[in-house]
Amino acid sequence: MDNQVLEQKIVNEEYKIWKKNVPYLYDLMFSHTLEWPSLSVQWFPDVRRDEEAGRTTQRLLLSTHTSGSEEEYILIAKVEFPDEFDESLNEEVGGDMRLKIIQRISIMDEANRVRYNPSACNVLAVRSDLPDIHVYDYTKHLSHEKIPRPDMVLRGHSAGGFGLSWNHLNPGELAGCGEGGEVCVFDVSQESSSISPTVVLRRHETAVNDCAFSFFDKKLLSSAGDGGMVVLWDTRSEDCIHAIEEAHTSDILSVRFSPLDGNVIATSSCDGSVKVWDRRSLSQPLHILLGHSKDVVSVEWSPHNDKVLASGSTDRRVIVWDLGQAGAEVPEEYKAEGPPEMKFLHGGHTSTVCDISWNPAEPFEIASVSEDNILQIWQMPQPE
């Protein structure tokens, strides 16, 4: 039996064990097979209640990655949560929840990342393998349009990539990064269909894999990339405030400012670690979180708890971390299960976890997507 067959057998066995234990591990678990993989997932902020039907409806922003097999789309889905779950419907995990794609917007190339503008959620930015960032206003597009018609094209990058970050404090400002090594900042509030960057930031000598604006300082931007370097920028003066040359021992794939603490930054890397930094003292990380066995693709802070963050990996796992537990004593019999700050391990995916998003309306609930077309919405047990 070759290694690939053996690995798949192990994955299948692990999944069977996980599925059997779902009722004991989760407050909520919903799994849905998409037509194509989505490399991107993000909860919209709106929540609609139907008291009569006893249901809550939320929306998710997704995309397609068909590898050239079909047209590519941005997808907007609605998810209906019943107040009470009917156990008899739970042959499929989360059987009485419903997910429906309510809008498809044709795009030029398969999306690496799609993010809505927090100041105007109808405005969506798409980062792909094309150099330009395309912006769509979903109120101006009919579903099933066959020809991609971006409302704005943001020019300035020399190559495609993954990094996209809207500025929560400066409406219409968007940063992007990619394989070309530059970080570009755009103002999409301009009345133009073709927009050049207001700022181009250069310090990285190789690919920049992610960028993120601060939630507390509108001119503070972070970027991270190949070679393990993190850079903090002042976008107004265009200065590099600080560079951590070797924040990780391998390429950094994700960087995020905490939405609840203006001094804290998280990074994740191909070295299998997540690190948490205080920007006032960047010589050493505050925390090094070890629990993944492969590349850590994404890291996202909880919007509800300043000590909690989650990470997704090519090891098929999502781990929720609680920094408040760092350094706590662990009984000998539990040490093999992971460090004290590992709050929860989600083992429902059987392929690389591409992206994760915390539900802003529901504490400890996460949407995660994987390379094998699976979208999962899950809620770990609530703390007492």
UniProtKB/Swiss-Prot annotation:
Disulfide bonds: none annotated. GO terms for cellular component: cytoplasm; nucleus. The keyword ATP-binding does not apply. Keywords: Chromatin regulator, Cytoplasm, Nucleus, Repeat, WD repeat. It is found in: Cytoplasm; Nucleus. InterPro entries: G-protein_beta_WD-40_rep, Histone-bd_RBBP4-like_N, WD40/YVTN_repeat-like_dom_sf, WD40_repeat_CS, WD40_repeat_dom_sf, WD40_rpt, WD_repeat_RBAP46/RBAP48/MSI1. It comes from the Eukaryota. The keyword Metal-binding does not apply. SMART domains: WD40 (SM00320). WD repeats lie at residues 156-196, 203-243, 247-287, 291-331, 348-384. One of its GO terms (biological process) is chromatin organization. Belongs to the WD repeat RBAP46/RBAP48/MSI1 family. Regulatory subunit of the histone acetylase B (HAT-B) complex. The complex acetylates histone H4 which is required for telomeric silencing. Component of the HAT-B complex. This is Histone acetyltransferase type B subunit 2. It comes from Encephalitozoon cuniculi (strain GB-M1) (Microsporidian parasite).
